[in-house]
Amino acid sequence: MTNVLEGFLREDYEKWGARNYLFEKKEDSFEPVTFAAFIEDVNYFAEYLLMKGFAEKSIGIYGPNSIEWMISDIAIMCYVGCGVGFNKDWSYDNVVYSIKKSEISCLIYDERQGEIMDRIRKEFPDLTYISVQKDFAGCIEEGRRASEGLFTLEGRPGDVPAKVVFTSGTTSFPKAVLLSINNVFSGWRSLGRRIDAGAEDVCYLFLPLNHTYGSIYNFIYSLVFGYEIYLAGSIKDMAQEMMAVHPTIFSGVPLVFTRFYEASKAMGVPLGTLLGGRMKYLFCGGAKLTPEIRKAYADEGMYMMNAYALSETSSGFSIDYPGEEDMESVGTLFEDVDAKVLDPDEDGYGELAIKGANVFLGYFRDEEATKAAFNEDGYFLTGDIGTIRNNKVYIRGRKDTRITLSNGENISAKRIEERVKEVHESIVSVKVYMRGDLLCTDIYVNDASAPKDAGEWEGLIEELNKIVSRFERIGKYNIISSSQMLK
């Protein structure tokens, strides 16, 4: 055994091999895969990829959450090289950029990506492509035939790059965050101090697997604690599915918890019933939930555990303990990290900085950005303004970032964010960055109240551009559901 992940795979195969583990909806019902079947497929798919020459290569995974994604993620990370997750909702330009940036040699893709994949194949004819629907089972079978037996492959070292996660920057192209297996497994003990999860628990997995929290804390840590996972379908089916599978663990963003709250009031059905009737642990990240909604869950005995972290900290920084009544905090600092507040003001607020096994290896092929992300004492600079009191973490907002244009003009990202937010009441968050000479924004909106007509958005941005300086005019914008607003 050369890494902690392989150790858990071996233990799980012995302890839980015959147990149902992953459930994915096929037609109208959830179909199970056992721990043994999953771990065997991981080994044989890794065998196939190594046989095809992908050792220590970057391999992309593109599509919605699926069991094939999970098999690929673990196989690549543990035995092959560096897995790179692509968001299923990315635009063609974002996928092209990410393929080039991460230097992938192979792309595992879902046929549901349709037209974008047709264009990608033409743009990158030299990549190896593996279709989830058409090729994946055959690849596993080929690996099985070539294998000398289960667990005969050598696991990769725990301290080398194993995972690339793209995180949206506020002033530039998305950065490619490099994580090792040791990074990925740095937080399970802190999570275990907060929850008593085990084989009797069920996680309803909604968060996308290309994000660190969904991938690490919902999926990968199931290999530590042994709980079952049901893959969520569409948002509109969530309540129906939860009432059918009765989960005990669920992680979401404020938009989802707000929708359940509103549905509960409108239908006159208790929140606990909508969430399946036996929910134990709710985790909320991405932004703070309002005290009113958080209290509504608490009144039914479901305590919302706020979580705060970044991709660069392997989604580990702070998580509430169950029953926490401090509505303003974003969680209790992990016990296994060294965090501090830099240059605090009179109220104790400054930039949050952190050291620990959770802190990433660096940005892929970007030494300058990596160097800028740390101070002279080796602390990672989060860019978030906050404070820590009695091990509770509080966030005030992002540190204002200055954007330097190609003509040398210096403008405030925060000022632009605030002005864009004023354009429409449905806007919940804005990210500002440069692409070439264009000032770009990702505009995260509440789906229920956001304009559906692209022409209306175009008109709103045109009106904004008329009243700002020529240096602050938006050159390109993307309208994105706030359900995608994860770090």
Where are these regions (language model features)?
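ANL superfamily adenylate-forming
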Residues: 114-158, 264-271, 480-481
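Conserved AMP-binding/adenylation subdomain of ANL enzymes
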Residues: 185-202, 209-278
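Conserved pre-ATP/AMP-binding loop-to-beta segment of ANL
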Residues: 18-20, 144-166, 173, 196-202
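Conserved ATP/PPi-binding loop(s) of AMP-dependent carboxylate-activating enzymes
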Residues: 332-333, 345-373, 392, 407-411
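AMP-binding/adenylate-forming catalytic core of the ANL superfamily
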Residues: 107, 356, 362, 385-472
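Conserved AMP-binding A3 loop
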Residues: 32-36, 162-188
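Conserved AMP-binding/adenylate-forming core of the ANL superfamily
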Residues: 21-53, 60-66, 70, 74, ...
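Gly/Ser/Thr-rich phosphate-binding loop
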Residues: 248-252, 260-326
